């Protein structure tokens, strides 16, 4: 591990030098990439330096214990030795976690898609509540949210919504939300007081930049059409809606929320890049990776990941057997404790694999 850490320190020092290089400073894309990696390695270097300092202190105490000491001094140095050994072990454990393989997409913005599943109007109403839950989470973290497209119904629910959350590391937090979310409650339209079960599917994709994935112009079919609101409201006389098809995969994206065709085209391409990258990533996963993701639960869409039981005021995450109460707080975006537990579970699984 020490050799690996020394390599990290060398890389960090090289990046520090690059950040002052005029050729890097004058290239915004390269500067952003260098700064991002520099920021990521900083905590590892800081922790390793603390580890090295503790090692030196431990050596000093061992040297003192080899010399002549009265009983009281020896007892004090022995206690300090125990404390330093404990500190060294803690730092070593923390460094092992920091050195775990990272998801290369963790630092990216995130594109999320919420779709009402089984349950009719009740599913669409819960889809709207989940959308609010994520926007409230974003507000708490001061993350920027942008709606890319939304389809509502007459019941006040959402059939489907595509939105983007812009924040460094947003994907690292929200990637655990992908899957089937199940709600159990008595719908407002239910006169007999019976509990109904409905489902909503959440897809989570990292935003891909042009440098991450190439979409060739000849692979795209772009159609423009007029966009109109529900019930004929805000009817757009110009052809501003954009329907974009990626021919090799058959993936289709439709954007009509903006008045400008150019804005809808830009949004559609952004979503298409994320979906195409996700499609190829799913195809490329090995059987071992599929098994790991099923165990850890970081995005299998068919997986029933969580149940929101309103009568019992509880939320259960089935992947790790976690149950929390105060469903009102959860629906108001207080889900960091659930995300933290999922992240810790993934860390433990990765550590076990590294040490196997």
From Swiss-Prot:
Signal peptide positions (record): none
Cellular location(s): Cytoplasm
Keywords for the protein's UniProt record, in alphabetical order: Cytoplasm, Methylation, Protein biosynthesis
One Gene Ontology cellular component annotation held by this UniProt entry: cytoplasm
InterPro entries: PCRF, Pep_chain_release_fac_I, Pep_chain_release_fac_I_sf, Prokaryotic/Mito_RF, RF-1
Pfam (any one): PCRF
GO molecular function: translation release factor activity, codon specific
Keyword Cytoplasm included in the entry's annotation: yes
Family matches, as HAMAP family: Rel_fac_1 (MF_00093)
Family listed: Belongs to the prokaryotic/mitochondrial release factor family.
Biological function: Peptide chain release factor 1 directs the termination of translation in response to the peptide chain termination codons UAG and UAA.
Protein name according to UniProt: Peptide chain release factor 1
Gene: prfA
